[in-house]
From Swiss-Prot:
Keywords, sorted A to Z: Carbohydrate metabolism, Chitin degradation, Glycosidase, Hydrolase, Polysaccharide degradation, Secreted, Signal
Recorded family membership: Belongs to the glycosyl hydrolase 18 family.
InterPro entries listed in its UniProt record: Chitinase_II/V-like_cat, Glyco_hydro18_cat, Glyco_hydro_18_chit_AS, Glycoside_hydrolase_SF, Glycosyl_Hydrlase18_Chitinase
Subcellular locations according to the entry: Secreted
Role played: Involved in chitin degradation. Catalyzes the cleavage of glycosidic linkages in chitooligosaccharides and in alpha- and beta-chitin. Its activity on chitooligosaccharides increases considerably with degrees of polymerization (the initial rate of hydrolysis for GlcNAc5 is about 130-fold higher than that for GlcNAc3).
Residues forming the catalytic site: 161 (proton donor)
This protein's name: Chitinase
GO CC annotation: extracellular region
Record's catalysed reaction(s): Random endo-hydrolysis of N-acetyl-beta-D-glucosaminide (1->4)-beta-linkages in chitin and chitodextrins
Signal sequence segment: 1-29
Organism for this UniProt entry: Enterococcus faecalis (strain ATCC 700802 / V583)
GO biological process: chitin catabolic process; polysaccharide catabolic process
Record GO terms (molecular function): chitin binding; chitinase activity; endochitinase activity
Length: 348
């Protein structure tokens, strides 16, 4: 299949040059040509694994499912593909489908796009060390655009963790790169989606994600804090005179509500994320994360309801991951789309 546009082999010279050097071909259009616009829409976000399950890969020795992208539960209207990272031959992160040709994978993306579902490229992940340096902006922008034109991605999710968040010049290079890409597609009347999924302790003033958020203000579409795998970290709440920890199942509603309220207003020691750009990140089940799983659906539904009553309805929910949502526990019992089934009604 021919691509929508041809990306030159030589570096583009400026932000303006991006539009000038890309020459349209006469390729027949497919649904992957459509850049799905999620502006103003509620989202249920489910990450997709770009690798085969090896079995017993869960925190409780369960097994994640191996899925084609097109097999992701249709309740997930935003599907980040995990992950874009360095292939070891260059600093510039890249992506390749693990089990399909470029043409076949593009057809998978096209199927989701035809259903009005956005497919993002997730940058990083827990085991990816990305270290860009000043001057990489244009080369990285070129690669992202090449990925979009090759596979039909609708945007990019910043999913940097650990040392990769601040490595090299990432905090300045990545936002500058994404502005180039977003402006390039804006010139075509399209919305290149930019999202982030930081672990929530990095959302404090002076913490590692502050630069990304402030630099991309006006450019990002939503932020989905990972409210899991952080043990006893949490938030002090004066109103109830209690430290509310992420790992405290007895106070799960209080954690979800007050963490959301803190982020919406930029209080209790956290940065501000507008309510219409806030997506809560939760694990699909106990195998998907070491802590943070919500045992019953009630605390999540109650949080959504109370925030709406406060006049601060939030954007939606995110989970790690769509593959885990249809995985199995250690005894071989299917998780049977528990997350999608429980929460899809909250984003309608």
């Amino acid at each position: 299949m021919k691509l929508k546009k041809i990306i030159p082999a030589f570096p583009l010279l400026s932000t303006v040059a991006v539009g000038l050097w890309l020459t349209p071909t006469q390729a027949s259009a497919d649904a992957a040509d459509t850049m799905v616009d999620i502006s103003g829409k509620k989202v249920l976000v489910g990450y997709w694994h770009n690798w085969a399950s090896k079995g017993r890969d869960g925190y409780k020795q369960g097994t994640s499912a191996s899925l084609n992208l097109s097999e992701v539960n249709q309740a997930y209207n935003v599907v980040p593909v995990s992950f874009m990272k360095s292939d070891g031959t260059t600093r510039i992160p890249t992506f390749k489908p693990y089990n399909q040709t470029d043409t076949a994978f593009r057809q998978e993306v096209a199927q989701l796009n035809s259903q009005g579902r956005a497919v993002l490229l997730a940058l990083g992940g827990a085991d990816a060390h990305i270290q860009l340096v000043k001057g990489d902006e244009q080369a990285f922008a070129n690669e992202i655009i090449r990925q979009v034109e090759t596979y039909g991605f609708d945007g990019l999710d910043i999913d940097l963790e650990q040392l990769a968040i601040t490595a090299g010049d990432n905090q300045t290079v990545i936002p500058a790169t994404l502005k180039i890409v977003k402006d390039h597609y804006r010139a075509q009347g399209k919305n290149f989606i930019i999202t982030m999924a930081p672990e929530f302790p990095y959302l404090k003033p002076g913490a590692a994600y502050e630069t990304y958020i402030t630099s991309l203000n006006g450019y990002y579409d939503y932020i989905a804090p990972q409210l899991y795998n952080q043990g006893g970290d949490g938030v002090w709440v004066d109103e109830i005179m209690t430290w509310v920890a992420q790992s405290n199942d007895a106070l799960k509603y209080e954690f979800l509500y007050y963490m959301s309220d803190s982020l919406i207003h930029g209080t209790r020691g956290y940065l501000q994320i507008p309510n219409d750009k806030l997506v809560l990140g939760l694990p699909a089940n106990r195998d998907a994360a070491g802590s943070g799983y919500v045992v019953e659906a009630t605390p999540v539904a109650k949080t959504f309801d109370q925030l709406a009553k406060d006049g601060n309805p939030i954007r939606g929910l995110m989970t790690w991951s769509a593959n885990w949502d249809v995985g199995q526990d250690v005894n071989g019992k299917s998780y049977n789309n528990e997350f999608a089934t429980r929460y899809s009604n909250l984003v309608k």
